[in-house]
């Protein structure tokens, strides 16, 4: 399932913000969020992320596929990594907690002993992990939908990246919708020839063979497109001299305010958690019985 990150002007408040300020603020918020496991602090970032998402004026139809992928990733990480294996939990959760469900059984033939203990602490940690991932996802997910693809290059260049790296990032973001379009065109063409991907049956090898008519044309077309871009850049002697950009970006007062708020938030997070050790995993006393 490919996601088309299509941009269209919406006239939202978020689109007026300098794209450099948006990237800087999102990155700083990312580093601030990962400092905490306390739901009280994570709710603050989650509310900020939701407020930004609402301000973008994005609709469910536009972001439905992106949300589907995010929800699948979040569910997989929370259910498998936290509730079942506990490999992603912090030390407090790994210790014995207040059990809600206990399953202990031995696997026949091999004799493996399976122990599954679902505790209040694990459930609360799963909620914290979900808020953490969703907050980070919302801060970054809205960028491709609300940022003009023509200014990606100058945005990364304005953030201090070299011309080559800035242009590479620009091409990478432009390539996603192109790949989606090629995939859709190829799928429609193969369906016109009687290809039915929905009826994929059999084992792993049979399923791989079934998707070959889609993967091979899309991959070959992507390689040829990449070669065309490289040849065009070589013919224009890209990289020999400093690049000039058509678009120009200029910070405004609210851009500095957003960056300043993000910096202050990160500094506060660093001081609160690593220095004062506040914001670690926390379970409210009212949900623990007796």
Where are these regions (language model features)?
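Transmembrane alpha-helix interface motif
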Residues: 1-39, 47-54, 161-164, 181-290
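Membrane-helix interfacial "entry" motifs
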Residues: 11, 58-62, 117-121, 125, ...
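Alpha-helical transmembrane segments and their helix-start/interface "positive-inside/aromatic belt" motifs
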Residues: 22-23, 59-74, 254-262
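Short helix-capping/hinge motifs at transmembrane helix termini and TM-loop junctions
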Residues: 37, 56-57, 84-85
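Hydrophobic alpha-helical transmembrane segments of multi-pass inner membrane proteins, especially
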Residues: 44-50, 58, 65
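Structural signal for the C-terminal ends of transmembrane alpha-helices
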Residues: 53-59, 147
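Juxtamembrane/interface alpha-helical elements of multi-pass membrane proteins
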Residues: 66-200
């Amino acid at each position: 399932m490919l996601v088309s990150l299509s941009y269209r002007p919406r006239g939202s408040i978020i689109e007026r913000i300098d794209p450099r300020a948006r990237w800087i603020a999102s990155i700083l918020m990312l580093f601030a969020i990962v400092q905490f496991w306390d739901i009280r602090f994570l709710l603050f970032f989650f509310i900020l992320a939701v407020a930004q998402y609402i301000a973008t004026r994005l609709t469910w139809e536009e972001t439905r596929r992106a949300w589907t992928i995010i929800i699948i990733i979040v569910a997989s990480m929370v259910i498998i990594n936290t509730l079942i294996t506990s490999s992603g939990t912090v030390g407090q959760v790994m210790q014995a907690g207040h059990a809600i469900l206990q399953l202990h059984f031995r696997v026949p033939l091999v004799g493996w002993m399976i122990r599954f203990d679902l505790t209040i602490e694990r459930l609360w940690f799963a909620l914290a992990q979900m808020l953490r991932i969703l907050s980070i996802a919302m801060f970054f997910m809205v960028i491709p939908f609300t940022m003009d693809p023509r200014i990606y290059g100058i945005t990364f260049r304005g953030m201090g990246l070299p011309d080559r790296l800035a242009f590479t990032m620009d091409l990478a973001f432009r390539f996603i919708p192109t790949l989606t379009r090629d995939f859709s065109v190829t799928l429609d063409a193969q369906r016109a020839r009687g290809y039915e991907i929905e009826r994929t049956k059999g084992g792993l090898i049979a399923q791989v063979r079934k998707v070959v008519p889609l993967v091979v044309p899309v991959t070959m077309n992507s390689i040829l497109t990449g070669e065309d871009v490289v040849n065009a850049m070589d013919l224009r002697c890209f990289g020999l001299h400093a690049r000039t950009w058509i678009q120009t970006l200029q910070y405004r007062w609210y851009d500095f305010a957003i960056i300043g708020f993000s910096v202050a938030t990160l500094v506060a997070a660093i001081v609160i958690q690593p220095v004062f050790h506040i914001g670690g995993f926390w379970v409210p006393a009212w949900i623990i019985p007796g």
